[in-house]
């Protein structure tokens, strides 16, 4: 597999799949980049430590501060305590939250990602009003304001002729 194909594959995988958490996975928030593919994270237990980014993500996916990642702990090493298993985007965060596996310490950040928070609304409706088709009462109200046209009015408009003068054109032959 060429480098470009690998990059495209990883980018599509991160952007399109929902991640299923495994028992030893830890959800963490990226605090800062330490350089050399090392990142400092704050995990769901409140511990702060350094994790490494695996080679499959390097040069194809970039991390931002306060972004969420799934970390798999590693036993060897003194400074590096884990490896990034998956980079969570907004859809994955909301999906894990719906499953009930989202840590309570990051709940406030997950609430900011919901549709209601972005719109500044708080509602318990399953479907937003703007996603529903218009009701019949709204259609009746709109139709009352419209004018109705008779066929006789249309025929009268067609019979009218206008004499216009255009100096750039030759005179039309008379009938």
From Swiss-Prot:
Protein keywords: RNA-binding
Start and end residues of each S1-like domain: 5-89
Biased composition (Polar residues): 165-175
Keyword Cell inner membrane found: no
Basic and acidic residues compositional bias, start-end: 116-128
Pfam family, one: eIF-1a
GO CC terms in record: nucleus
Alphabetized GO MF terms: RNA binding; translation initiation factor activity
PROSITE patterns for this protein: S1_IF1_TYPE
InterPro entries for this protein: EIF1AD (IPR039294), NA-bd_OB-fold (IPR012340), RNA-binding_domain_S1_IF1 (IPR006196), TIF_eIF-1A (IPR001253)
Segments of this protein annotated with the region Disordered: 116-175
Ranges of biased composition (kind: Acidic residues): 129-163
Family statement: Belongs to the EIF1AD family.
Name of the molecule in the record: Probable RNA-binding protein EIF1AD
Organism: Caenorhabditis elegans
């Amino acid at each position: 597999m060429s480098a470009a194909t690998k990059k495209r594959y990883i980018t599509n995988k991160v952007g399109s799949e929902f991640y299923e958490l495994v028992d030893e996975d830890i959800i963490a928030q990226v605090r800062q980049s330490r350089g050399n593919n090392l990142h400092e994270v704050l995990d769901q237990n409140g511990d702060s430590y350094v994790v490494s980014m695996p080679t499959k993500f390097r040069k194809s996916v970039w991390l931002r501060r306060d972004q969420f990642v799934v970390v798999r702990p590693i036993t060897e090493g003194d400074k590096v305590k884990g490896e990034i298993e998956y980079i969570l985007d907004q859809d994955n965060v909301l999906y894990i939250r719906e499953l009930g596996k989202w840590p309570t310490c990051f709940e406030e950040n997950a609430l900011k990602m919901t549709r209601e928070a972005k719109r500044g609304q708080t509602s318990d409706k399953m479907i937003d009003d703007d996603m529903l088709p218009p009701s019949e009462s709204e259609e009746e109200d709109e139709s009352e304001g419209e004018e109705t046209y008779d066929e006789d009015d249309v025929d009268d408009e067609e019979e009218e002729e206008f004499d216009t003068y255009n100096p750039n054109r030759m005179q039309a032959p008379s009938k």
